[in-house]
Amino acid sequence: MKNFAGVFLVLLALTVASAIAAQDKRAKEKPLVLESQGSFFVGGETKSLAAPAGARGGFGTGDITINQMYVQYQIPPNSDRHVPVVMVHGCCLSSKTWETTPDGRMGWNEYFVRKDRPVYLADQSSRARSGFDPSLFNAVRGGTTPPNQLPNILAASHQTAWSVFRFGPAFGTPFPDGQFPIEAVDELYKQMIPDLNSTLPNPNPTWTNMAALAVKLRGAILMGHSESGFFPEQAAMIDPSGVRGIISIEMPCATMTGPQVATLSKIPTLVMFGDHLDMQGGGNWAQSFDGCQKFVQQVKDAGGDAEMMHLPKLGIHGNSHMLMQDKNNLQLADLILDWIDKHVESKRRK
């Protein structure tokens, strides 16, 4: 019993020390001033749901809403001077991606707000606060659908995340020049949640909801990462009217048709990749990079404004796949903000 108590006290002390360290990192910052903050949903459709097997109480047959997208926002004073920025997370994650980093530093959402940008964080449809459609699971549980019809639910293991996010050449061994705060990697693992995108219809409702959100905001810059990295382009091909700019971070690029490229060539586009793309067993990042280079060139050849920002070519080394959480995340945010000012905001002011 004494040993258990001792272990508990050690864990408690470590937790408190971690919290204090995180607070110390934020102590010198000025108060965050907001004009408003809040949340809402975009999209959604009604669907009939049969009562689950063995349901209790009032959980009978009825209607539910599915495919909606949860959005939270923060709007700073003087925000009308800038185009809103919508940030969408990748696989097995939520909009926590953009918030406070695993080691307690400022995330991109707050930094962009402090730079007078209205920021909207979206949870992909079927993920986190957006909810998911349980009907197929209930049908299998009720015996009306065979178990082999259940979709896969992705849940990234620590080992998978380490490899795919390019933290180091082997699990537990970080790159010597790595920018991710490895001492806080356990905090990142806590952010990993089930990915139910395989339950969604095609086209993915997140694309439609992102396009609708851009229209609702009377123009927005759409930013995607990893799984959602090409979502801004997909949203623009559904309805480009509200999309003022596209920022795609570390993703596989799709092959575009001539008409699709023509649509995207009218929207300023930035693609960003980090370091160690040739890492073996880590998600075919070199192939993704090559595909995105071809995409950027396609848009440029069509007369569009597109740029590939490969950080090592800028002399910035060691960035992981989770570059918005890396130790130099604010340096990278400044690169993006500068690109926005030159390629999106400048055109808006003309």
List each language-model region with its residue ranges.
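Catalytic active-site module of serine/aspartate enzymes centered on a nucleophile-bearing elbow/loop
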Residues: 318, 322-350
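Short beta-strand element of the alpha/beta-hydrolase
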Residues: 81-91
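Conserved alpha/beta-hydrolase
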Residues: 105-130
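Conserved acidic catalytic loop of the alpha/beta-hydrolase fold
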Residues: 200-221
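The feature captures the conserved acid-bearing segment of alpha/beta-hydrolase catalytic domains
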Residues: 245-311
